[in-house]
Amino acid sequence: AHHTGLPYGRVDVGYLLDHAALDAAGRLAFRAKALRAAEHLLLCRYFDYCQVVYQADVVGFEWLLEDVVQYVLEQGTWRNLDKDSVYEMVAKGQWAAIDDMCLMAKISELRGDMGTPPHVQEKSKAIIDRHPPVLLGSAERIGQLRDGWLSDTKTGLDAMVDDLTRKLRIDRAFWKVWTRGQPWASVGGKTEEKQDRRWITILRSDVASERIQEAPGSIMSVLGDRQLDMLRVYLLPPASTCDVEEARRFIDDYLNSRLGSA
């Protein structure tokens, strides 16, 4: 939010830094005076995710890039990019050669290489031509933190896409079921251990602290056990396939039924 200029104000980073401290466990925390500024940071970050990071075309292109880069790595174009290999390439002055231009040149080669699998060819072409995949359907809801709705709905979507794959005779590699659960009160983290370290913490005294959603009177005390559940189904139609409306209808009906039962 501080850098994108999105219309919900600027985070007072300086004020937050002025009130940063360590709690008894040595974790970064903010003094109670900075509670509202910290909540503003979380709200801005939440909307930043929704409007920028999780924007529909951005997510679609990320899927294409991930799949194409994975294919390039599997073909041995570059060595395994583990830590030791990267250190070795840096030492030999080779790492600088693997940049955006190098990757785009490789993707351009894949687009015209008849030995490339069709789905990789199509994805490479879409990246070069800047044509995002088709968004067949999407759903969002604010629900309880990790209540199972997201995973259950994804399971149903995966089964439906498998059926549509057979019915429409479009390879499964052209489809993507994308999900994300974005908590309001957290700044990220995938595992419980990492998640615990990444909660914003507020000092109650000189050393004692509590997570921001436990602070009395905080907005996050209401939103702390909530998350935004997001689901999307993408399709990159092969060149020979144009009609995707049948798939769109099936997916919309399913997602609407799931939202109605939430």
Please place each PLM-identified region on the residue numbering.
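Histidine-centered, transition-metal-coordinating active-site segments
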Residues: A1-A262
